[in-house]
């Protein structure tokens, strides 16, 4: 076991108290993780923190995005104040894509891979209206102009036959509306080569050709 110790100067404003114990604030914790933890892990922490602070709602998306942008700017300002710290480039890349609209760690990791591949930025949880069924679907990640989507599937999503039937109807409806998509599982996330091939196969060759890896998100 390798034990590493690091000494950092901690401003009083970055310390709070929980159950009588001194701990770092939510935003400071997000920053420390963005600097020191692999991006596929720190993005989950950053997304979760933004979701807790913003409390986004689908029917007030613009207001939710505004609150998220305000918090993200604060994180970026504090990050630049620590720019000499090791891991700054990685931290910038993580904070830049942090979003309150990710609904699970699996979605966050999937988006980290998408961004690391250099693909166009996806829209999280956009509404796709189905006029026939009179319902709105919300894919996890989507590229509306291309009618491409990615969905993360955890086991809890399919606990009953009703869940399976509802998901089948959803997939059929999106296909009928001209959308193409892939469903990503934890097994895919544990196999980056397979996952990347799965994602890239969805996109037109010209977009794949223009894509450039983002090394800060592969660290």
Locate each region found by the language model.
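Basic, glycine-rich
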Residues: 127-137, 143-219
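Active-site glycine- and acidic-residue-rich loops that bind
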Residues: 100-103, 132
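Residue-level signal for threonine
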Residues: 25, 104, 160
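Short beta-strand or tight-loop elements
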Residues: 118-120, 124, 137-139
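Short acidic-hydrophobic surface loop/beta-edge motif
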Residues: 15-16, 126-128
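Phosphate-handling catalytic interfaces
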Residues: 1-100, 108-113, 117-121
